[in-house]
Curated annotation (Swiss-Prot):
NCBIfam families, A to Z: L17
Cited Pfam families: Ribosomal_L17
Family that this chain belongs to: Belongs to the bacterial ribosomal protein bL17 family.
PANTHER family for the chain: LARGE RIBOSOMAL SUBUNIT PROTEIN BL17M (PTHR14413:SF16), RIBOSOMAL PROTEIN L17 (PTHR14413)
PROSITE patterns: RIBOSOMAL_L17 (PS01167)
One Gene Ontology CC term in the entry: cytosolic large ribosomal subunit
Keywords for this protein: Ribonucleoprotein, Ribosomal protein
Species, as recorded: Blochmanniella pennsylvanica (strain BPEN)
Record's protein name: Large ribosomal subunit protein bL17
Subunit structure as annotated in this protein's UniProt entry: Part of the 50S ribosomal subunit. Contacts protein L32.
Xref: InterPro entries: Ribosomal_bL17 (IPR000456), Ribosomal_bL17_CS (IPR047859), Ribosomal_bL17_sf (IPR036373)
GO biological process, one term: translation
Matching HAMAP family: Ribosomal_bL17 (MF_01368)
Gene assigned in the entry: rplQ
Length: 125
């Protein structure tokens, strides 16, 4: 029985779901905004918010934990150096979900998920 199990399965196996969210976290940190389905955006918010909260305190343990979730050193560096300073005084709610209509092919509800302080975060050239 599936009683009291939170989170949606999104019609994927657990390995596929974990890999998909790992890729989505990397894309969101690198680009600060991504377009996806509404249900994936809501599920992604539950994954990215704790990572940003962890990145506020720069310790080796937190860096290793975030690396284990993302498997990307560039993402870890960007989270700790560029993104977390803008969210230091914010207690939560680091992402915003904006609905953007329906997908043409299958009529799925689409949404943008973005970092709230996205305009202030400096782009490294």
């Amino acid at each position: 029985m599936r009683h009291r199990k939170s989170g949606s399965k999104l019609n994927r196996t657990s390995a596929h779901r974990k890999a998909m969210f790992k890729n989505m976290v990397v894309s969101l940190v690198m680009h600060k905004i991504i377009k996806t389905t509404l249900s994936k955006a809501k599920a992604l918010r539950r994954i990215i918010e704790p990572l940003i909260t962890r990145s506020k305190v720069d310790t080796i343990a937190n860096r290793r934990l975030i690396f284990s979730k993302t498997r990307n050193n560039d993402v870890v560096t960007k989270l700790f150096t560029q993104i977390s300073p803008y969210f230091y005084n914010r207690p939560g709610g680091y992402t915003r979900i904006l609905k953007c209509g329906l997908r043409k092919g299958d009529n799925a509800p689409m949404a943008y998920i973005e970092l709230v302080e996205r305009s202030k975060i400096k782009q490294k050239i």
